[in-house]
Curated annotation (Swiss-Prot):
GO terms for cellular component: membrane. Keywords: Membrane, Transmembrane, Transmembrane helix. This is Transmembrane protein 42. Its main location: membrane. It is found in: Membrane. The chain crosses the membrane at residues 37-57, 67-87, 100-120, 124-144. It is a multi-pass membrane protein. It comes from Mus musculus.
């Protein structure tokens, strides 16, 4: 018996169709939007857990804290930090760029820190601080935005 190459009907190689592109662009691949959503979601969660860790540390090492509250704050800080790094690494794996993931985590952390600071400690932020948050949000929007290719770039292809 001669064992010849067996081909299944489902597997078609790219060599059979030499004029077809080998791979679609990343934005057109199956599940690209879903991956992008989960990347952003994980990065937002990482920022929130980072802010929660900072709030727990402030609670644990405050000026008038008993030993039980201090231990509880340290455990909460360690747990929130480990969750933050877990979500950040998952966000990096889903994200198309580490810059996008880093800026998303930073924005989420700053915003959640402001909210937790107001809710837990009654802290209010200055208008200049909110202006900085707005500029970070503008930069984040520009990073997440995908510009269409220019006429010159499309002509070269």
């Amino acid at each position: 018996m001669a064992a010849g190459p067996q081909s299944s009907g489902a597997a078609v190689s790219a060599a059979a169709y030499p004029d077809s592109p080998v791979e679609l662009p990343a934005r057109l691949q199956k599940g690209a939007m879903r991956r992008r959503f989960w990347g952003v979601f994980n990065c937002l969660c990482a920022g929130a857990f980072g802010a929660l860790a900072a709030a727990a540390a402030k609670l644990a090492f405050g000026s008038q804290v008993n030993i039980g509250l201090c231990v509880l704050g340290i455990v909460a800080m360690a747990s929130a930090n480990s969750l933050m790094w877990t979500f950040f690494s998952r966000g990096l794996s889903f994200s198309m760029s580490s810059a996008i993931a880093s800026v998303t985590v930073t924005f989420s952390n700053i915003l959640c820190s402001a909210i937790l600071g107001y809710l837990l400690y009654g802290e209010c932020q200055e208008i200049l601080w909110w202006g900085g948050v707005f500029l970070i949000l503008c930069g984040l929007t520009l990073i997440h935005r995908k510009f269409p290719p220019t006429w010159k770039e499309s002509k070269e292809q």
